[in-house]
Structures are given as structure tokens and as C-alpha cells.
């Protein structure tokens, strides 16, 4: 029968519940007009199938007048199609409230309210809500939360450092891994895990200007962190009172900040939880004076609780510079340089003794005496066991010494020697004749290192005489690419102009499919270029990158690198090779270096190869050698006789070998053990790879996409294209792009195809979609027909989902202890709870949908019977809720008590444990337990099942 509509009646939209209560304005022929006063919206509906539900309250319900006062309904009259409610107000006085005067802002979000208001959802949505609760709970309790969802290969030492640091309250540490070991990824993991856990909510990243873009790409591509890049232009153009307050993550160039006092004032006023400083070894400090950059970072470190400093290794820095970084972290502990030097000297024999134990499995009398003097009498029994060959005692001894390490808690430093998995490098050099066109060029700064730039900058260079038509390196490159057919080749050169010209040359002279990558391209253009290069079937054979353009990118699916020219600094050379030379690279790195004979290019090649050995190995001494020999090197590149040049090469080689020996003897194996995690990181890697192999996420996401009206279609193997459909339910679904996106659940695919979104449980699309499910009301009611021969037709079962809810700051991380897992209750007609015998999935398989109108009619007819049964469900579930809260309190107390005991014992032997850490942990324990005491039981969803 058609609905009877009267002006003034109150109805609610089934599809737009957020509009509040609607008022019927008019019925005109086949159209119905409804006003939603709360939002000011008007809707017109086809009369026959308007998606509306009549709002009808019952005795016992609490309702609100539009002026704000409330009443409890006792009776309901129907006067000419309009409802009039009679009942008691807050002062227990008899009042009358016509439905026309109901509050416009009433929304039916509580499951019971929506059920009895006729807002009944599809079965699929009820299942989606249940599974969302289960998956959310599982992730909040996972030890991988914040570590497993990153677009990077899981690497043991990085994961160990990230978990160790990110799980501290306001961590203050120095990340000083050798080049190529992934300090930026370690910092990103710490930031990501701290943000997800709630330990930090505002992060400030300070970097040198030339690294801003690299950080931006890394944070967005790897961690899905939307970092705001600040410079002078953005700061000035912002309309905000304080531009820094508008962003959660700010990326700022240190050079600009030092020169802009107004920006400094705004930065300090904004307030931050975590400060990250890259290239911290460039902050100059001396006992009598500090640079402006150092002083600024020092002031920030005084007011920001957490600090991460990314820096070169201590051995590269030298002791004084190393001390300068440590005093930024803890000025109370590291306040005296001379005392620090003495402490370091005293500790050196202990580190050497540990080295002996690790190498030989036993201790010499001298090493025994050294460790005994360090540990005192308490270490005697342990040393005796070690000498008796007890391997467990040896491991325990190393842990004891580690705890007493002067900087073991604040300094993490891994070396390539300690971390396995790096590929071998092979060098292929190609001396080529220097063309006359270059020989005739006037000399200038680096003119003969990059002669093509100088040549092309001349006026009136004709198209047919462009540099790439006569430069022998171009002919050589074409021949080399033909020889390496079907092999991916990365070409790097110093300048963007050279990269673009080379792409032209390959297209005109060879037809070899190539793409280019330079700093003039935006991120989307670079993504497309990288994707074209990564495509095995139809992609480019060669990617040509400029120096700056390739920063922050990972091309390790390739293992052939062409250095079309050589950079002027060894650090830049290492960065180039580092695009391919990474942990996880499965092939030998083939380095191809063409250079022009009898030119500065040839001399620079000799410098890097013969003096620095920078092609075949990493060169940790390169910066120091460049600083020492640079003033002599540059003039000799262009003008020197062979004897003078060879003398420089020999002198630099000898100095390099001396410095490398110093580095080796200065290695602190104990510190390396601590930084590497001694096996803990390996376990995390295994857990992440196991999680990657599970199908729970793709299965869940398909149901999420279906529910929200997102179309998915195959793109290629392991990849899908997502697009909003015409029936998209919620425009706020975090798809990322209204035009659609390409996604993959496969980590290896995501690493080679940066244009694809890597979907994990931590991805913003997943988290945002789950938030939409749980924050909305869809799926918290359902009615279904149950087909089960054991049930008498007409039998009504009631399935109730409850959640133990605690309202607390995210920084307390109470979700780890009391996650929102559903407490499920399945009541039969006699009030018995069958949930222990019938699982959710078993029940789900027996259910069929019921037309909405029929379901609504049934609910209204059964309202008086259902209401007391719903109330009885809470009584049934309350003991389980109490057990869950008690268990959460026990686990929280046990975890914090264990950590407090560990840190208290550690503080007795290692002063780098700050009092503030212990105070914060005790406060967190007290607050967490107090909040858990207030945990409440909330009815999350109701499903009514009718046997048929």
C-alpha cells in the first residue's frame, strides 16, 4: 500500500541520515517535497519509492523539543495524520509535544534507535561492521603496527631500530648508520609508528635545502605521510596567523630558517612533539663557539620532547663533533667534552675485549681482567661461566656490557661490515677520444668535466651540430644499450639539460625506448617515467636521470648503471651508485664509466678509482679526503704534469688507507650488536613477510569497495584499477584521486611500480575506509531470514554486538590493551546465549535478506518483545566486558612494570636513561589504569533473525 504523506509529518532519509529530521512540505502529483531544517536542504522524491522512513517514537523514548528541552514519551496520539506526544519533562511536569516541534537535529545513530525507526541496513553492511571491528582490534595489538605497511623491503636492522626508538616516550637518539644502510627509512619508520600509536602528533623535519625534495618523495611514496614543504614563498603567502599550525608534518630547509627570524618565531610558537634533523654532522660546534645552525637546533631540542638526529658515523665525525651531536640530545649527561673523551678512552679496552669474545668465543686473561674491572664483583660468576664455555653466559655477558655502554641507548650505528646483503660491484671503464669540438672550448668552472653543457650554451649552435651528434660517449651508449638488449639500464648525468638531450639523441639516432627523469618534472611526471622504466613488457630499456632528479628513488630492479659523467664530490658519486647498490639487490652492480681521454674527466676517474677506491667500495673517508685534498685537486684536473698528478694520487691513497685502518680499529662491535638487534629484527622481517602472504586484506577490501560503490577491475598481474562508480555511497571515501587509482597488495610490485598505491592495513585508504564504517551508523542494524531445520519457523533470534569502549588520549595506546573487538551475544527466545556454540561465520552462511519494507513491518510488530530482550543482552555481556577490562588492566600494568624495572636497573649503570623517561612511564601507567576503570559497554549493532 502506498504511504500516506501529510504536510508537517517528520520523516528521515534512508540514504542521507546526516540531514536530520525532514518535514513534509507538499505532495504534488507524483512528487514529494521534504525540507531538512537542520541543514537547510530540500529534496524532491518520486512518490512511489521515496527512500524515507516515518519517524514514530514510542512510550519510554526520550525526545527533544526544537528549543532544547526533553520529554519522556508516555502516550502518542494520531491527529489527522500528525503525531502528538504526551509525557513528562525534566521537572516531571506533564507536557505535550507535536511532531512538528521536534528537534531538527535528531539523528538515529544508536543501533536500537535506528532499528525501531525503521532504518534497517543490508546484511553485507552488518558483516562489514563486524569484520572491521575484528581487523581493527587485530592491528592495534600487532607488534608490526607502523612497521609493516611501508613501501620498502623489510630489513632487520632498520626494523629493530625503528621499534626500539619509536616505542619510547619522546625518544632522543642519534641515527648514524654508514651510507647506504637506510637512515632516512629508519627515521620514516620511527615517525610513522609514533604517529600511528599517538605518541607523536606533530613532527618537524629540518633538512638541507638540497635534500628537501628527496625527503618529500620518501615520506609520501614510502610512508603515505602528507608532509608540507615550507619555504619563504609559502610562509609569506599563507593567510594563517601561524602557517606552521596548519600542518601536522612540516618539512623545512635549515638554510632558510636560520636567515628568517619571523619564521623561527612562528616555528617555536607552533609546538612540536618530534624534531628530525638530517645531515646533523654539518651543524658546526666548538667548545668556545657554535654556528647559527647548531644554536637554532639546540634551542629547538630544548623545547621539543623527541629528537632524531641523522648523521655520519662517529668515526667519520671525530670525537669532538660526535660529542656535539650527543649534547643536543642530553645536555645534562653530555656537558663536558674532556670528561666524554676520558670516558670513551676508558671504554675502548672493554669494546676490544668484547671483540675478542665474539671472534674467538673465549676471553684471554687480559680481556677477563678488563671486563672484571668494568663490571665489578657482580660480574665474577658470569665471567667464570664464560670461561667454562657457557654460550648462554657469553650472550648474557654481552647484554650486561651493552646496558652499561656509555651511548648505547642514544646512538644507533650499523656498518656494512656488520650488515650482510650488499651486492658486489664491477667496474667497466671506457676511455674514448676527446673530439676537437670540445678541445677548442674556452676553459671555465668544470667546463671540461661537462663539456656538452659548455658547448651547447654557445650562441647559434645549429640543430645538425648539437653536441650529441659528435660526442663519442653517445655512440658508445647506443652500442652498449644494443648489447644489453632487454636489460634495464640506469643512466645518470650531472645536469637536466644533458639528460633531456640524451633522450633526444636516443630517439633520433637509435629508436631505443628511453625515458627521462630530472628536477624540472613534477612528482606525477616522475612517477610516470619511473613506471614506464619499471614495466618489463612494454617499458623503456633505459632511464636517464639528472643528479638531483633521481634523489629518493629506488631502481634496484636494475643492476646496470652508466655514469655518463662524474660528479665533483665523492658523496654524490656514492649517492649515484646507491640508487642500485642497496640491501636486497640480487645482482652484481655493473658500473659503466665512459670518459674522454686526455681530459679532466680522465683525471677525475683516476682520482675516484685509484686514490679513493670509490667505484668498487663505499668510501666512508671520501668527505674527509675531499676536504683535505680538494684545493689541490681541482687545479690539477686541468693543468698538471704526470709526475705531479701521480704524486697526488699516491699521497691521497696512503691517507685513505690510514683513515680506513683508523675506522676499522675504532669500530665498536658492542655498539654494532646493539644497533643490529641481535636477531630481534630478523623475527620482525619474518612476521612482516608472513603478513604479506595472507589474503585477509584483499578479501576485506573487496567487501569495503562493494559497500561504498567503488568499482575495481584488473589492471595487470597483482594490480587493480579503482574508480568511483555512479552509485558511490560516500564522496569522502579516501580513494586518493576522483579519476581513479591503481593499487597493488604485492610488496615487490609496489617497489618497482611507484605509480601504484601499495595497499596495506596501514594505508590511508584502508584506515580511512575503516573509520568511515565505524564512525557512521550504516551496518548497525539488520534483519535476516535464517534457514535452519533445527529452528521452528517464526522463531526469533537476536544477535547483539557490543564494544568495550574507553575514551582516552591516543598517546596512552589503550587500544593495544582494550581494542574494539566485538563482544557478541546470540540470544534465543528463552534468553540463552548461543554465541559460544554458533560462530559469526557459521551463522552468516545460513542467512537470507529480507525486503526492507517487510523487515520494518516485522520490527514494529515485535517492538514490545524485542526491547526487553535487547536490555537482557547487556546483562548477559556485562561479565565478559568486566573480564576484558580486568585483563587489559593486568596487561597494561605488567608491561609498564616490566619496562619500569628494566629502565630503573639500567639507570643504575647507564646515565643516558633520563629521569623524565621514568616519570613519563609512571604517569602513563597511572593514567591508563584510571581510564580503563571508566571503560563502558556500548551496543554497536543489532541483527534480528527470523526462522523461515
Swiss-Prot record:
Record PROSITE patterns: HELICASE_ATP_BIND_1 (PS51192), HELICASE_CTER (PS51194)
SMART domains xref list: DEXDc, HELICc
EC number from the UniProt entry: 3.6.4.-
CDD domains per record: DEXDc_RapA (cd18011), SF2_C_SNF (cd18793)
DEAH box, short sequence motif: residues: 278-281
Domain Helicase ATP-binding positions: 164-332
EC main group: hydrolase
Pfam families: Helicase_C, RapA_C, SNF2-rel_dom, Tudor_1_RapA, Tudor_RapA
Positions contributing to ATP binding: 177-184
Helicase C-terminal domain: residues covered: 473-627
One GO BP annotation of this record: regulation of DNA-templated transcription
Chain ranges passing through the membrane: none
UniProt entry keywords in alphabetical sequence: Activator, ATP-binding, DNA-binding, Helicase, Hydrolase, Nucleotide-binding, Transcription, Transcription regulation
GO MF, any single term: DNA binding
Complexes and interactors: Interacts with the RNAP. Has a higher affinity for the core RNAP than for the holoenzyme. Its ATPase activity is stimulated by binding to RNAP.
Free-text function comment from the UniProt entry: Transcription regulator that activates transcription by stimulating RNA polymerase (RNAP) recycling in case of stress conditions such as supercoiled DNA or high salt concentrations. Probably acts by releasing the RNAP, when it is trapped or immobilized on tightly supercoiled DNA. Does not activate transcription on linear DNA. Probably not involved in DNA repair.
Record-stated family: Belongs to the SNF2/RAD54 helicase family. RapA subfamily.
HAMAP family assigned to the protein according to its UniProt record, in alphabetical order: Helicase_RapA (MF_01821)
Name of the protein this chain belongs to: RNA polymerase-associated protein RapA
Organism from which the protein derives: Pseudomonas fluorescens (strain SBW25)
Amino acid at each position: 500500500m502506498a504511504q500516506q504523506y501529510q504536510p508537517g509529518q517528520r520523516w528521515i532519509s534512508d540514504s542521507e541520515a546526516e540531514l536530520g529530521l525532514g518535514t513534509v512540505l507538499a505532495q504534488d502529483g507524483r512528487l514529494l517535497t521534504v525540507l531538512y531544517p537542520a541543514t537547510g536542504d530540500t529534496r524532491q522524491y518520486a512518490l512511489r519509492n521515496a527512500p524515507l522512513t516515518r519517524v514514530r517514537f514510542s512510550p519510554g523514548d526520550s525526545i527533544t523539543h526544537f528549543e532544547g528541552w526533553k520529554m519522556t514519551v508516555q502516550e502518542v496520539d494520531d491527529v489527522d495524520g500528525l503525531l502528538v506526544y504526551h509525557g513528562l519533562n525534566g521537572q516531571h511536569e506533564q507536557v505535550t509535544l507535536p511532531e512538528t516541534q521536534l528537534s531538527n537535529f535528531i539523528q538515529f545513530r544508536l543501533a536500537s534507535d535506528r532499528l525501531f525507526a525503521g532504518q534497517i541496513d543490508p546484511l553485507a553492511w552488518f558483516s562489514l561492521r563486524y569484520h572491521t571491528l575484528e581487523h581493527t582490534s587485530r592491528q592495534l595489538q600487532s607488534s608490526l603496527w607502523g612497521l609493516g605497511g611501508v613501501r620498502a623491503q623489510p630489513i632487520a636492522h632498520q626494523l629493530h631500530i625503528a621499534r626500539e626508538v619509536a616505542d619510547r616516550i619522546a625518544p632522543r637518539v642519534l641515527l648514524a648508520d654508514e651510507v647506504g644502510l637506510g637512515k632516512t627509512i629508519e627515521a620514516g619508520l620511527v615517525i610513522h609508528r609514533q604517529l600511528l600509536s599517538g605518541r607523536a602528533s606533530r613532527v618537524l623535519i629540518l633538512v638541507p635545502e638540497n635534500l628537501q625534495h628527496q625527503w618529500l618523495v620518501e615520506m609520501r611514496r614510502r610512508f603515505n605521510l602528507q608532509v608540507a614543504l615550507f619555504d619563504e614563498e609559502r610562509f609569506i603567502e599563507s593567510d594563517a596567523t601561524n602557517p606552521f599550525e596548519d600542518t601536522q608534518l612540516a618539512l623545512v630547509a635549515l638554510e632558510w630558517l636560520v636567515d628568517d627570524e619571523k619564521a623561527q618565531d612562528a616555528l617555536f610558537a607552533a609546538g612540536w612533539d618530534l624534531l628530525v634533523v638530517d645531515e646533523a654532522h654539518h651543524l658546526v660546534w666548538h667548545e668556545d663557539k657554535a654556528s647559527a645552525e647548531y644554536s637554532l637546533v639546540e634551542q629547538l631540542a630544548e623545547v621539543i620532547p623527541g629528537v632524531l638526529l641523522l648523521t655520519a658515523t662517529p668515526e667519520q665525525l671525530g670525537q669532538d663533533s660526535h660529542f656535539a651531536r650527543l649534547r643536543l640530545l642530553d645536555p645534562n649527561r653530555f656537558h663536558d667534552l674532556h670528561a666524554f673523551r676520558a670516558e670513551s678512552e676508558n671504554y675502548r679496552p672493554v669494546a676490544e675485549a668484547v671483540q675478542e669474545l665474539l671472534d674467538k668465543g673465549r676471553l684471554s686473561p687480559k680481556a677477563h681482567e678488563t671486563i672484571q674491572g668494568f663490571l665489578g664483583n657482580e660480574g665474577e660468576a658470569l665471567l667464570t661461566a664464560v670461561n667454562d664455555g657457557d654460550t648462554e653466559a657469553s650472550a648474557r655477558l654481552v647484554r650486561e656490557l651493552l646496558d652499561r655502554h656509555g651511548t648505547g641507548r642514544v646512538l644507533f650505528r650499523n656498518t656494512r661490515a656488520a650488515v650482510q646483503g650488499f651486492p658486489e660491484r664491477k667496474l667497466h671503464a671506457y676511455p674514448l677520444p676527446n673530439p676537437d669540438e670540445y678541445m677548442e672550448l674556452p676553459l671555465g668552472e668544470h667546463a671540461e668535466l661537462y663539456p656538452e653543457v659548455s658547448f651547447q650554451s654557445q650562441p647559434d649552435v645549429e640543430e645538425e651540430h648539437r653536441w650529441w651528434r659528435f660526442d663519442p660517449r653517445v655512440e658508445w651508449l647506443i652500442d652498449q644499450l644494443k648489447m644489453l638488449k632487454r636489460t634495464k639500464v640506469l643512466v645518470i648525468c650531472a645536469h637536466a639539460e644533458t639528460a633531456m638531450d640524451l633522450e633526444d639523441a636516443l630517439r633520433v639516432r637509435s629508436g631505443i625506448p628511453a625515458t627521462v627523469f630530472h628536477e624540472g618534472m613534477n612528482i606525477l611526471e616522475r612517477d610516470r617515467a619511473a613506471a614506464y622504466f619499471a614495466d618489463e613488457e612494454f617499458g623503456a630499456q633505459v632511464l636517464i636521470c639528472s643528479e638531483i632528479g633521481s634523489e629518493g628513488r629506488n631502481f634496484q630492479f636494475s643492476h646496470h648503471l652508466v655514469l655518463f659523467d662524474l660528479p665533483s664530490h665523492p658523496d654524490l658519486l656514492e649517492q649515484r651508485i646507491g640508487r642500485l647498490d642497496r640491501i636486497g639487490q640480487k645482482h652484481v652492480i655493473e658500473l659503466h664509466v665512459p670518459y674522454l681521454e686526455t681530459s679532466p674527466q680522465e683525471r677525475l676517474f683516476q682520482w675516484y678509482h685509484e686514490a679513493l677506491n670509490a667505484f668498487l667500495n663505499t668510501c666512508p673517508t671520501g668527505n674527509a679526503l675531499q676536504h683535505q685534498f680538494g684545493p689541490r685537486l681541482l687545479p690539477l684536473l686541468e693543468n698538471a704534469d704526470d709526475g705531479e698528478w701521480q704524486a697526488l694520487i699516491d699521497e691521497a691513497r696512503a691517507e685513505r688507507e690510514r683513515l680506513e685502518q683508523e675506522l676499522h680499529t675504532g669500530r665498536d662491535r658492542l655498539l654494532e650488536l646493539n644497533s643490529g638487534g641481535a636477531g630481534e629484527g630478523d623475527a620482525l622481517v619474518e612476521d612482516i613477510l608472513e603478513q604479506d602472504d595472507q589474503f585477509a586484506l584483499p578479501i576485506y577490501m573487496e567487501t569495503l569497495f562493494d559497500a561504498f560503490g567503488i568499482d575495481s577491475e584488473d589492471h595487470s598481474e597483482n594490480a587493480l584499477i579503482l574508480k568511483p562508480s555512479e552509485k558511490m555511497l560516500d564522496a569522502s571515501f579516501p580513494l586518493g584521486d576522483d579519476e581513479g587509482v591503481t593499487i597493488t597488495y604485492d610488496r615487490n610490485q609496489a617497489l618497482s611500480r611507484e605509480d601504484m598505491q601499495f595497499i596495506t592495513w596501514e594505508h590511508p585508504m584502508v584506515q580511512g575506509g575503516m573509520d568511515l564504517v565505524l564512525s557512521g551508523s550504516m551496518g548497525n542494524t539488520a534483519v535476516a531470514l535464517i534457514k535452519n531445520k533445527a529452528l521452528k519457523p517464526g522463531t526469533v533470534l537476536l544477535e547483539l554486538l557490543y564494544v568495550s569502549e574507553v575514551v582516552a588520549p591516543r598517546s596512552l595506546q589503550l587500544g593495544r590493551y582494550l581494542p574494539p573487538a566485538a563482544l557478541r551475544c546470540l540470544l534465543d527466545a528463552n534468553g540463552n546465549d548461543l554465541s559460544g556454540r554458533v560462530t559469526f561465520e557459521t551463522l552468516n552462511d545460513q542467512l537470507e535478506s529480507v525486503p526492507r519494507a517487510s523487515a520494518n513491518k516485522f520490527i514494529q510488530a515485535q517492538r514490545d518483545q524485542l526491547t526487553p530482550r535487547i536490555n537482557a543482552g547487556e546483562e548477559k555481556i556485562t561479565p565478559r566486558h568486566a573480564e576484558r577490562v580486568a585483563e587489559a588492566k593486568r596487561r597494561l600494568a605488567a608491561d609498564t612494570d616490566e619496562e619500569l624495572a628494566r629502565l630503573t636497573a639500567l639507570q643504575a649503570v647507564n646515565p643516558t636513561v633520563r629521569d623524565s623517561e621514568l616519570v613519563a612511564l609512571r604517569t602513563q601507567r597511572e593514567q591508563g589504569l584510571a581510564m580503563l576503570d571508566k571503560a563502558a559497554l556500548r551496543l554497536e549493532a543489532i541483527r534480528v533473525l527470523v526462522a523461515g
